[in-house]
Amino acid sequence: MAILPILSYPDPRLRTIAEPIKTVDAEIKQLIKDMIETMYDAKGIGLAATQVDRHIQLIVMDLSENNDSPRVFINPKVTPLVEDKKPYEEGCLSVPDVYDSVDRPVKVKIEALDADGNAFEEIAEGLLAVCIQHEMDHLNGVLFVDYLSRLKQTRARDKVKKYLKTREKQLQHNKA
């Protein structure tokens, strides 16, 4: 397994629309393992393939407290089941150190394939509903900051640049 580099906002590759996966082969299964390891390493709860510069419809997620229940969503489709929206505080591995509130439908239906290519569907509410919608946005080239005002988007971009500079300095210092 390998930890993959995660693209950071405002990288234009994050705006790429993901293509459906035609077959769940050994390469896809390896990517799933690598994405799960990457998500855990980055202390995230969800990761879309777009974020690791693979523009295919693949999401991994683990909402458990112990990081012991990874889930896989291949070629997912999400349908809101209610018009009611609720604000949720969101963050993103591609927009490090930025958190803000986004209104999302509170109940959705998920249709997808699992890691073995088997179709499933489920009704999601709460954190699962929020997380799957957030990750689906990535597959469509949308980031949670797109829902924010222009001012907040500018602040987010500046904060990410500062975060990445600080992280780069720390990495260089650790090598010395």
From Swiss-Prot:
NCBIfam families: pept_deformyl, PRK00150.1-3. Fe cation binds at C92, H134, H138. Its EC number is 3.5.1.88. Belongs to the polypeptide deformylase family. The keyword Hydrolase applies. It comes from Psychrobacter sp. (strain PRwf-1). Pfam families: Pep_deformylase. CDD domains: Pep_deformylase. GO terms for molecular function: metal ion binding; peptide deformylase activity. The keyword Protein biosynthesis applies. Keywords: Hydrolase, Iron, Metal-binding, Protein biosynthesis. It catalyses: N-terminal N-formyl-L-methionyl-[peptide] + H2O = N-terminal L-methionyl-[peptide] + formate. InterPro entries: Peptide_deformylase, Peptide_deformylase_sf. It comes from the Bacteria. Its cofactor is Fe(2+). GO terms for biological process: co-translational protein modification; translation. The active site is at E135. It is an enzyme of class 3 (hydrolase). This is Peptide deformylase. Removes the formyl group from the N-terminal Met of newly synthesized proteins. Requires at least a dipeptide for an efficient rate of reaction. N-terminal L-methionine is a prerequisite for activity but the enzyme has broad specificity at other positions. Binds 1 Fe(2+) ion.
